[in-house]
């Protein structure tokens, strides 16, 4: 929040074009390509439900705009795609507004591990609310524990290590399905927007530490075979003092 405010003040004073703040039209229009790529990867169809993490609010309304432009151009069928906003419970000003039926976003002080989406006063929050309303979607939030559990679930089932924004999206999608807002048998796009390497500290303490072994093939085989018998993955640190790990 403070950085966005400062960048806006700098742009006003010096006439500079700071590309990664919400008030730059070229930046926000560029976010539509995310929606275009979703349609392309779906074989030029739209998912019936798209869940997007919300920070400053730039991406979600532009995904919705991308969908509407594709529909108007006749490139995809209008299947009434719904858009959902996903936020951390410790910073959920947009979701709170959606639930309350308000257009006004009330700023919050972020308290969450999901730092990349911890924007307490989102500049484009109003447009997120409008896109969600127009599409017939909803807003959902997830606790820090739910976010971590979702990160682990995605890694275990899909081999994808996401940072907390993606964990938030998955956790919120699960809750939307369980609450009946998203049918289980319809197409769902879960937006995973960041790599877990950005926030390694989030999962530290939530996973088993690696087993250290000497740099011997027999020692490695023993650990792997033991893990296979137990039906578990085997994190291994090879060699004394080594930071190499093999799943």
Each model region followed by its residue ranges:
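Beta-strand segments within the central parallel beta-sheet cores of soluble alpha/beta enzyme folds
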Residues: 48-53, 78-86, 185-191
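Low-complexity, intrinsically disordered Ser/Thr/Pro- and acidic-rich segments
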Residues: 240-242
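Active-site/ligand-binding loops adjacent to catalytic centers
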Residues: 3-19, 69-161, 205-231, 235-238, ...
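Catalytic phosphate/nucleotide-handling subdomain of diverse soluble enzymes
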Residues: 170-231
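Active-site/ligand-binding-proximal alpha/beta "capping" segment
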Residues: 9-74, 148-152
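Buried hydrophobic positions in well-ordered alpha/beta secondary-structure cores of metabolic enzymes
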Residues: 38, 50-51, 83, 117, ...
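Short, well-ordered secondary-structure micro-motifs
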Residues: 30-31, 62-63, 94-101, 200-202
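Short glycine/serine/threonine-rich phosphate/pyrophosphate-binding segments
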Residues: 54-63, 91-94, 165-173
